Amino acid sequence: MRLIIRPTYEDISKWAANHVAQKIKEFSPTREKPFILGLPTGSSPIGMYKNLIKLYKDEKISFQNVITFNMDEYIGIEKNHPESYHSFMWKNFFSHIDIKKENINILNGNALNLKKECEEYEKKIKSFGGIMLFVGGIGPDGHIAFNEPGSSLTSRTRIKTLTQDTIIANSRFFEGNVNKVPKSALTVGVGTIMDSQEILIIVNGHNKARALKHAIEKGVNHMWTISALQLHKNTIIVSDKKATYELKIGTVEYFNDIERENFNNDLK
């Protein structure tokens, strides 16, 4: 596991965007050989999306031959609801780039058969040979996607009941009203994410410091699903300084030392 520590949220957003863009460029995707990208929602990736949009507008990257799979979607709200993850992705990313609509995959939280929807999502990911790069964030309790504490670390895409902590945290998107937040969602599983060739996690803010400590310094534990990534062969966590405040000084110095030459990853 790699840990890239940068001073601010703006710095890690730029670093994450550059990393995603570089991976796509290195792959040189075509219509017959697309790049398969896993994407998150929430507040953590917004800065990354803004930077990716800028790279696209500066003609440094194209998404025409990129196929995306999103991590999750609420159950019971329409796609055009302002707080659905369909709406989030179109507002913050898809409508600003050249991605083809048919290349966008987001779980349908209103499918008639939700179990079948999850099974078909897994099959579609596998049909493309799996996710090449899965980008994500984490919650204060260490959850990744909607894999709440206690989730199986081998779980697949499924229906998941949200914890009260997650509902409260997400109420900021629903006028601060916890009663308006959906109580369940469809989510890729920890196992689904672990099958990806590479994982990039964005961590920012004081409230994520405890989760980052469990991700980096503690053992693998299903109560902190982010910790499963310790077992992945190619995971990068990019974190701002605030999120490192519970890490040991030695841990921070170690990663700063070995990653020093990777702090600047601007596209050539």
Swiss-Prot record:
Pathway: Amino-sugar metabolism; N-acetylneuraminate degradation; D-fructose 6-phosphate from N-acetylneuraminate: step 5/5. It catalyses: alpha-D-glucosamine 6-phosphate + H2O = beta-D-fructose 6-phosphate + NH4(+). GO terms for cellular component: cytoplasm. The record marks S151, R158, K160, T161, Y254 as: Part of the allosteric site. GO terms for biological process: carbohydrate metabolic process; glucosamine catabolic process; N-acetylglucosamine catabolic process; N-acetylneuraminate catabolic process. GO terms for molecular function: glucosamine-6-phosphate deaminase activity; identical protein binding. Signal peptide: none annotated. This is Glucosamine-6-phosphate deaminase.
